[in-house]
């Protein structure tokens, strides 16, 4: 398995029309989860992926499993929990594409993920372990599971990819900054938004982040995503500006995960740092043009067509 990831995937109810939830009566049922999004994005780009999690032994849990499996991602690491329910969220889109989410996930099956759910076999055969800052703040057992996965990855020389994915709603008034910084410092590939960088390190300037994380730290590749402004990618010796890929943004949720999938696919294919950044930018941009987290994710063939048809900067 090329990529292994772990975290919660919820059932997401999406109104068919824009407006406040109080006025909605017609919803689509989809899935939402940063880690499974990345796994699905990578799978669409031609790479194998496995998702580790827990879901309730309920209809929503079955829907989540079927949906992830239908995208080609292995769910061999998913455990059914007969005592806790599958998490649920609602998405609301207002005028101007202002999107907000409401969670009903406290005490969910996935919040009981623990080191016992992580096996040597799952990690040692992987080429990349991908984690986010969402999972470790869900519960103490989830935090321990994340650290156990990293411990195994380091032991088997599996590179770790980490996206802070800061969700202050999940912090519940607690300060998890040091936790997220510690996890980021253990990553080989650190993929974060500019606002997250400012929150964690007091700066979004790529030169300072490069010095702090790549030269003084152990991060091999750093990507700082900045939405419509493009991205900066760097190593200890390179710092490259990635121009934004032109798109018409309809729904930005899931775009960061799509960038991650594209960037990591480049790594798996032995691409240069600049190429990894460009692939990530294209995948992230295209994901915003369709409503839903994963509906706009590119296939390997679609990505190749877009790259071959663009100006030199994207070839």
Label the predicted regions.
Residues 1-74, 97, 294, 315:
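Glycine-rich phosphate/adenosyl-contacting loop at the front of the ribokinase-like
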Residues 3-4, 151, 205-315:
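Conserved phosphate-binding/catalytic region of the ribokinase-like
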Residues 40, 88-92, 230-233:
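Short beta-strand scaffold segments in enzyme catalytic cores
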Residues 42, 193, 256:
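Short, conserved phosphate/pyrophosphate- and ester-handling motifs at nucleotide-, phospho-/glycolipid
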Residues 48-133, 304-315:
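Conserved N-terminal subdomain of the carbohydrate kinase-like
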Residues 128, 134-211, 229-230:
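Conserved beta-alpha-beta core of the PfkB/ribokinase-like small-molecule kinase fold
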């Amino acid at each position: 398995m090329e990529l292994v990831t772990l975290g919660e995937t919820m059932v997401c109810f999406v109104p068919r029309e824009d407006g406040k939830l109080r006025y909605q009566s017609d919803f689509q049922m989809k899935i939402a989860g940063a880690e499974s999004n990345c796994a699905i994005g990578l799978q669409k780009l031609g790479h194998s992926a496995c998702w580790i999690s827990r879901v309730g032994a309920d209809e929503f849990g079955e829907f989540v499993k079927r949906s992830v499996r239908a995208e080609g991602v292995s769910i061999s690491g998913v455990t059914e929990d007969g005592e806790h329910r599958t998490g649920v969220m609602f998405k609301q889109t207002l005028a101007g594409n202002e999107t907000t989410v409401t969670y009903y996930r406290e005490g969910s099956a996935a919040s009981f993920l623990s080191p016992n759910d992580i096996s040597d076999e799952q990690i040692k055969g992987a080429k990349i372990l991908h984690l986010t800052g969402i999972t470790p703040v869900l519960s103490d057992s989830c935090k321990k599971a994340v650290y156990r996965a990293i411990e195994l990855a380091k032991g088997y020389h599996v590179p770790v990819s980490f996206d802070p994915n800061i969700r202050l709603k999940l912090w519940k008034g607690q300060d998890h900054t040091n936790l997220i910084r510690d996890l980021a410092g253990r990553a080989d590939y650190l993929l974060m938004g500019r606002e997250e960088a400012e929150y964690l390190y007091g700066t979004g300037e790529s030169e300072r982040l490069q010095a702090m994380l790549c030269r003084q730290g152990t991060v091999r590749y750093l990507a700082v995503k900045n939405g419509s402004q493009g991205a900066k990618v760097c190593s200890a010796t390179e710092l490259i500006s990635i121009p934004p890929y032109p798109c018409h943004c309809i729904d930005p949720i899931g775009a960061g995960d799509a960038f991650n999938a594209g960037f990591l696919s480049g790594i798996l294919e032995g691409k240069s740092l600049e190429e990894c950044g460009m692939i990530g930018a294209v995948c992230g941009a295209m994901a915003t043009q369709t409503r839903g987290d994963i509906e706009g994710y590119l296939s390997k063939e679609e990505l190749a067509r877009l790259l071959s048809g663009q100006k030199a900067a994207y070839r």
